[in-house]
UniProtKB/Swiss-Prot annotation:
Protein name as it appears in the record: Phosphatase and actin regulator 4B
Family note: Belongs to the phosphatase and actin regulator family.
Ranges where the record places region Disordered: 1-38, 83-105, 120-625, 637-666
Protein species of origin: Danio rerio
Originating gene: phactr4b
Gene Ontology biological process terms in this record: actin cytoskeleton organization; closure of optic fissure; enteric nervous system development; negative regulation of integrin-mediated signaling pathway; neural crest cell migration; neural tube closure; positive regulation of catalytic activity; regulation of cell cycle
Amino acid sequence: MENRDDEVEHQHSTMGSEGGTAGDGTPPPKRKGKFSTLGKIFKPWKWRKKKSSEKFKETSEVLERKMSMRRPRQELIEQGVLKELPDNESGEAHGHKAPYVKNGHTLPVGVGGSLALEQVHSPSESEFRINPVWLPQPEDRRARAPSDGDHRGALGPRASNQDDGRRGGWSVGTEDWKNNLAWHGEDIRRGGRAHAEMDKRPGLMKAPSEDGRRTRPEPDWKPTLPRHSSVEEGRGRRESDSSQYLPNSEMMRDTLREPLPPKQSIMPPKWLMTSTPEPGSDSLPRTPVHNPAAPSFCSSNSSSSSSAGKPLRNVSSAGANTAPPGGAPLTTSSAPCSMGTIPNHPSKQPPMPPPKPINRSNNPAIMAELTQGGMNLVPAKPSPPMPPKRTTPVTKRNPEDSPLTIASLPSILSEDMRANIPGGYQLPPPPPSPPLPTHIPPSPPRAHTHHLLHQHSYPYPLPQPLPVHFDPPSPPEDPPARDEDDYSDEEEEEEDDEDDEEPPPDHLPSPQSQPELEPRSRRCLVGELSVSVIPEGNNSSEEEEDEEDQHPEESDSDGPVLYKDDESDEDEEDDSPPSALASRVKRKDTLALKLSSRPSAPDRQAPERQAKSEHSGLSWQSKEQWEAIRTQIGTALTRRLSQRPTAEELEQRNILQPKNEADRQAEVREIKRRLTRKLSQRPTVAELQARKILRFHEYVEVTSAQDYDRRADKPWTKLTPADKAAIRKELNEFKSSEMEVHEESRIYTRFHRP
């Protein structure tokens, strides 16, 4: 690792030295002056693009290749392109380095990718940065020189945090999470031997091993794994180691009162990874109690996860990152390895506190990964009661829908585990769609049991759910399939009031079916994070129609409008409505009322039959009520009719034609008379010729004429060579005999060729 980074730094320095003088043979002269940079800018002969040297290209290619080697490995593993290969090439050759492993099994992939940044810093710098943060440390831990494993374990959280933060998210495959959580739970139950290998080597100093690390070949960059011949041998060695190294719970409890730095909120603190018991503290050896049904699950898990060779993160990052500052004890226990191993001393294991809300952690994708996937969620232990905070949505419970009892738990729960679960606690059922695996997958920590249950029953993929943080101390309920951060606390209080007023519904869907969305509820199916569809149970327009039919005097339109045509629309526009949108909405409402309540179109002409047909669904108790409604409809109609323009206004606006046929005939006759008078007053052609207005005859004279060429004669264009020779001969004769020339200048007379 150091060798690789030294190469990169050396190439950076050579890039800087060679890139400056790549194009020129000689370096530019150094001029000391205030305006010396202006001479460098305004040199047009220097403005051509310089060729980049071969070394520069090779160096940049090597750098790009090395950078690209680091990044996409975890994404390729997630997509199934790469398979995880065991790194046992470098395990035996460099066994002196404390391996960054846990029980000889693998890390999740993201830590392996981020180890490339770990070894860049010097040991003094890393210890200076890490140690003052986690304040109380044991004396023997502080006295000895930090080993290489401590250095790497300390730098692991920060380096991987920076590296993953640059990539904009951390997506780890669910199989890696399963392996990590399963083996993590088993390790802590067996005595906290997360980094016992590292702490057992106090004699290895960092300074002498620097040179040895620099000369390591490339395959040894990855961390080495200790190999055991079989699973049972490794398990026995872990159990023997775990009796000596137990984390001190008092030291953990004191350190919790110190504020955690925000930079490392994703990863566990350093003392949680590499802590050793203080001398004199009581460290009881814990022997794991195995259930008879458990070893098959655990052995299948161990064999599956020991075959993969990636380095394993030692502490569950979601469980240990955020602890309440009020001195609540933090645990290192995770979920048991498929409920197989149960701690012998439950008093030594304080329960896991639920994490704080999401704004403490910098990377919500890790939290979302824990709550996603096809794993069965079975809580390990109930969390201590926290002060109630209104973050869980209120669902309407069916009185018949009793919470699940302990007897209805999955069969993988042993009797001891069932005894630990309180009576009122309700376990969420596993998701229905994915097929059951061959071995029971391990469960994540207690803090994430609030799972989106109906995730697998949707036909389209849901986005990554936001994590649900903790339950209130009341008995938990089935969470609805939605995010809980979608609305504020005030809306939840309103929803509580609505839920108290409404009676419970007649039927609730079973937890394994798709949830039914009730009317007026804020529950929604999340298709995309940017688009939330809030379905209503009934048509909202139909509900409004029913309300308006039952309370006609409260509606704004004074009952349904029975008759309305285009002219009344025009009158509404003439009356200058408050806005076009309001008039359009009003028009649509009245049209919907009319169409939904009227069975046939010919009733449009008869308002009384319309009134009967519209209110046929309602029972009239008395004739007075019927008359009142009829008069109300009549007043609405007369009001609408009184708003119409008169016939005179329509005639003035050329909309309505006059209905009198005699007037129309008289108008036509008047037009004809005017036209005939104009035509009768027109003068004849003879009068116009006599008055010299018309100067042409009414006939055409035809004469015969010969064709001729109107173009001018150009005889020089038609000369033959004989004509040209005759012209030259005549010209020469004229010059020689007839042209008067001075005798002295006759020699200069120019003659043409014959």
